[in-house]
């Protein structure tokens, strides 16, 4: 998608659809005057309340290539960044559904929006562009089109070809800068969604490594891939144990972005890369197993966030670590009751082979501390269904041994719209993962499942004082039938970038 920023009045821009944003207050006060000035031939009905993400379609008398369709987009109270992101997302969905290619947003009131939301115009421009890219996203690369009926081919959604931010006036330079950032962040988040949406037969651990290499080429940072031989040499027993039932080899990917100047901090991001999770010998139920292609969401988010950080030129060193494999049953697969030795030397009793993510993360967390000793370690993983039970599908679980880090991640969640909620890491939970035959057990029984998983991971950070674990099992992937686009969400990319920008 091309993005154009112009000082030209929005009503004079060549476009298929023109968007006017209104808060609830502005809808009552200004809508009549604004719409009359555009030549809109009818007013919205009383059902349109300008709630955040609510839209209404109107028409106007237009000449030439000016937009005849006008969308009213509600931003609710207009007090948060998320109000504007929701509105832009809804507008993009509607534009794609109408098979229209050029979308124009009226940005002339951006100073008022900035005052209401306490955001800078540059930040709001980025948010609007991110929202449009998110709403316009479609995953259809695996469709051949051969079964489409001739008469329905014209009805296939067409993605937005150009986004125009119009009426920018004296804020042109700031909006251009913000739009550029929004294009980077939105594109990287959508690449993460592409990876997560790929089924297991299209995305192996080696394919995921190749995607990281391509991200490195685009972002200009170094990517190193360890093959199975190197993983064996390093003694990554957790990753190797999970991979035992697979015919596909594992990989361990290192992404290393270094800024041009001196880095203010070194941040390690660890992403779970289980490309398909059958549960292994502890086989999952058939219903919903197809969605387990999304069990590498943490890896996709880490790859995308580092590419975005590099493209934005953030003054931080950001190291990404991605242990990758699928988790399959088979004659050589690990079994419940097995005892494995991880890279750290800590032995683990495997009570359930479907608690595999923590095994591969154990090696990656230890490697991060041992090789880089970073200022901060953050891991992201679709780790536990228990987190969904606790927090639902919209919020991620947050665990940290550092109060200040936890607070920073929470605030980044609020600003990015990718919200997290902190859960405890109290010592009492250690009792639940004790083993009679090994140093630690990989499951903790029925209760507090998301907490015991985090407590397990904590044992592999080798005493690091600034670590956080984010369980994204709920918000990483949306099932069909919801109000959002089904499939991968890319949850975590904006969260990490807001956090990294805060440290910049």
From Swiss-Prot:
- One GO molecular-function entry: metalloaminopeptidase activity
- List positions binding Mn(2+) 2: 272, 277, 295, 356
The record's CDD domains line, in alphabetical order, gives: Peptidase_M17
The protein's Enzyme Commission number: 3.4.11.1, 3.4.11.10
GO CC, alphabetical: cytoplasm
Q: How is the cofactor bound?
A: Binds 2 manganese ions per subunit.
This protein's source sits in the domain of life called Bacteria
User: Which leading EC class covers this enzyme?
Assistant: hydrolase
Tell where it localizes: Cytoplasm
Magnesium is among the record's keywords: no
Name the InterPro entries for this protein: Leucine_aapep/pepB, Macro_dom-like, Peptidase_M17_C, Peptidase_M17_leu_NH2_pept, Peptidase_M17_N
Catalytic residues (UniProt): 284, 358
Cofactor(s) recorded for this entry are: Mn(2+)
Record: residues binding Mn(2+) 1: 277, 354, 356
Keywords annotated in UniProt: Aminopeptidase, Cytoplasm, Hydrolase, Manganese, Metal-binding, Protease
Q: Per its UniProt record, what HAMAP family does this chain match? A: Cytosol_peptidase_M17
NCBIfam families registered for this protein in UniProt: PRK00913.1-2, PRK00913.1-4, PRK00913.3-4
- PANTHER family, from UniProt? CYTOSOL AMINOPEPTIDASE (PTHR11963:SF23), LEUCINE AMINOPEPTIDASE-RELATED (PTHR11963)
General function of this protein? Presumably involved in the processing and regular turnover of intracellular proteins. Catalyzes the removal of unsubstituted N-terminal amino acids from various peptides.
What family is this protein classified in?
A: Belongs to the peptidase M17 family.
Q: What is this protein called?
A: Probable cytosol aminopeptidase
